[in-house]
Regions:
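Membrane-water interface of transmembrane alpha-helices in multipass transporters/channels
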Residues: 77-88
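Short cytosolic juxtamembrane segments of multi-pass membrane proteins
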Residues: 107-121
């Protein structure tokens, strides 16, 4: 179940980033035409993908922690403990998924021809 959730999250990030590249084609073309290195464009979109996944991981951790506390409140005999190592590992996995999912759209954005990109607007 967890693997399927990670896969769906990764596909969601790829989709969101692909749409972002398509919507910002003109901006990307302008940046490249003004001399921005392709590496900068790549890092811009990779950073956005990582930020999205880190935020999603953090919100998921908050939701999980809140649900665990609600269960502990309803069933006090049930011990609820979340080790910090699990929290850090979960956030690291979320960031890694975001980084992996952002590579394709970021490479596509970095490889855009500035003339064609500016022509689309």
């Amino acid at each position: 179940l967890g693997g399927i959730s990670l896969l769906v999250g990764g596909v969601g990030i790829v989709t969101i980033m692909t749409i972002a590249v398509a919507e910002r084609t003109g901006e990307i073309g302008l940046l490249v035409a003004l001399g921005a290195p392709r590496r900068t464009i790549l890092l811009l979109f990779l950073g956005e993908a990582v930020a999205l996944s880190a935020l999603g991981g953090f919100l998921g951790l908050l939701l999980g922690f809140g649900l665990a506390q609600a269960i502990h409140f309803a069933l006090p005999a049930l011990p609820v403990h979340t080790p910090i190592s699990f929290v850090l590992l979960a956030e690291a996995v979320a960031i890694a998924i975001g980084l992996a999912a952002g590579v394709l759209p970021a490479r596509r954005a970095a490889r855009l021809d500035p003339v064609e990109a500016l022509r689309t607007e």
